[in-house]
Regions:
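PLP-dependent amino-acid enzyme catalytic core
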Residues: 1-472
């Protein structure tokens, strides 16, 4: 069995299935594997040209540690990626001799979150059914995670899903993907606050152990290790398509909660030859500032055209602190306590140096983001969403070394942000025909104050696990 440990060192070690159902560790930390599995260069090279779901099985298998049979994992991966509307699942497009764009938006809700969510919903339902358990999933979303979770978990017998999103701070398409499902096990809550407020509510509920146990609480934000593992796969498939492992590659990743780019770090730890992981931030640039100064300091969140990155508390950064700090859990606890008390912490010199060896960072403001949307349309005839545009703007600043392929992650379909795209380049992206009815369906949502007690009471009222007393 693969063992998982908490970044804060005070929670029990767990196996893969328990980590997936647990989400946040009971000490407030995040789970990571005690030892990183390795893939040989021959194994990685062998991924070339294989179906995406087969590569997913080979990448995920060592993390599952024998807890899920290969045949079951293969069946669920095949089903999950059959929901995507491109034969390659996540196609890699060449934009210039050395720059590629990895399209992660061909899933049911047009965002990269579908890649992990379509698989994790099947994995969770499979494990719950085998154990005869139900769970209550509470998820915070800055826009895309919620829609992907609703699509993936709607109608499942063993799961109740409650989605928290910042009221008035996401696009209409994003909101409607959460509010129009009609499934009895799905509940959308518009919280009067920011995404960071929503995420803080979810963490507070996990840290209320009596409530957590009563509802059999679980989470599918990227605090959940299974989400990260599922995203590792496309780093391998895209890098191999661009020439790895015979040559190294760079990745440029639109970054908010640090989950997607951390999956790239995991791929590198497993043996993928990645030269640089570049964080692309909008004006909410806490991670870019941290890499520059060594000080992680929360500032006011500014609403932008790339709302999924309008974040100041990047949860998955804690996983990197733990790894870069050589598994110093006490050190992580000190940093997180400082963040909680003062809204800032100073990175130890050795930790900062270790992070800078693997990552660099850039930011793009609203003007630069709009210019990148215009440039993609003018030069390549491509409409790109604002998050992808941030990454393109950051990538295009460093074009001195053209020997290493640069892969920009395109995380959402432009039609999820039609107003921003049209304002930038004059072209309005259209939703795919199969989503025609989305904008006219009736919505079901509840506006709620940023109040932990009020949210917990609502969750208790809809949780079948709580009502049946089956929390385990």
């Amino acid at each position: 069995m693969t063992r998982y440990i908490s970044t804060r060192g005070e929670a029990p070690e767990l196996g893969f299935c328990d980590v997936m159902l647990t989400g946040l560790a009971r000490d407030g930390g995040l789970y990571v594997p005690a030892i990183w599995p390795q893939l040989s260069a021959d194994t990685i090279a062998g991924f070339f040209g294989r179906p995406y779901w087969e590569v997913a099985v080979d990448v995920i298998r060592p993390f599952a540690g024998g807890e899920i049979a290969d045949a079951e994992l293969g069946r669920m991966a095949n089903e999950a990626y059959a929901t995507f509307r491109h034969p390659a699942v996540v196609p890699l497009r060449q934009m210039s001799p050395h720059q590629f764009v990895l399209e992660l938006f061909h899933g049911p809700t047009l965002a990269f979150k579908d890649v992990a969510m379509q698989l994790i919903s099947r994995l969770m339902d499979h494990v719950l059914a085998k154990r005869g358990q139900r769970t209550t999933i509470v998820v915070a979303t800055s826009g895309d995670t919620g829609g992907a979770a609703v699509e993936a978990f709607a109608g499942l017998e063993n799961v109740d899903l409650i989605v928290l999103f910042p009221h008035g701070r996401i696009s209409e398409v994003q909101r409607r993907m959460m509010t129009t499902t009609g499934a009895a096990n799905v509940h959308a809550l518009a919280i009067e606050g920011t995404f960071d407020d929503c995420q803080a509510l979810v963490k507070a509920m996990f840290n209320n152990h009596r409530f957590r146990d009563a509802t059999s609480l679980s989470g599918v934000n990227s605090i959940n290790w299974a989400r990260i593992v599922a995203q590792v796969v496309y780093y391998f498939t895209s890098a191999v398509a661009a020439g790895a492992p015979a040559r190294a590659v760079d990745f440029v990743v639109p970054t908010g909660n640090f989950g997607d780019i951390f999956a790239g770090y995991v791929a590198k730890r497993m043996g993928l030859p990645v030269r640089t992981l570049r964080i692309a931030a909008n004006v909410n640039d806490i991670l870019a500032r941290t890499l520059k100064t060594g000080i992680y300091e929360v500032r006011e969140v500014h609403a932008t055209a790339s709302p999924s990155m309008d974040i100041q508390i990047s949860s998955n950064f804690e996983r990197l602190l733990f790894e870069a700090g050589r598994h110093d859990a006490a050190g992580v606890r000190r940093l997180m306590e400082s963040l909680k008390q003062s809204g800032r912490f100073v990175l130890p010199d050795a930790t900062l140096a270790a992070i800078r060896e693997e990552f660099d960072a850039g930011r793009a403001d609203e003007t630069e983001t709009a210019a990148a949307i215009r440039a993609a349309w003018r030069e390549a005839g491509e409409l790109v969403d604002p998050h992808t545009a941030v990454a393109l703007a950051v990538a295009d600043r460093d074009t001195t070394d053209t020997t290493v392929p640069s892969i920009v992650l395109s995380t959402a379909h432009p039609a999820k942000f039609p107003d921003a795209v049209e304002a930038a380049c004059g072209q309005r992206p259209q939703l795919p025909a199969w989503l025609d009815g989305l904008m006219t369906k009736s919505e079901h949502m509840k506006v709620m104050k940023n109040d932990q007690g009020e949210v917990e009471r609502f969750v208790l009222s809809v949780s079948r696990a709580a009502k049946q007393g089956v929390a385990g």
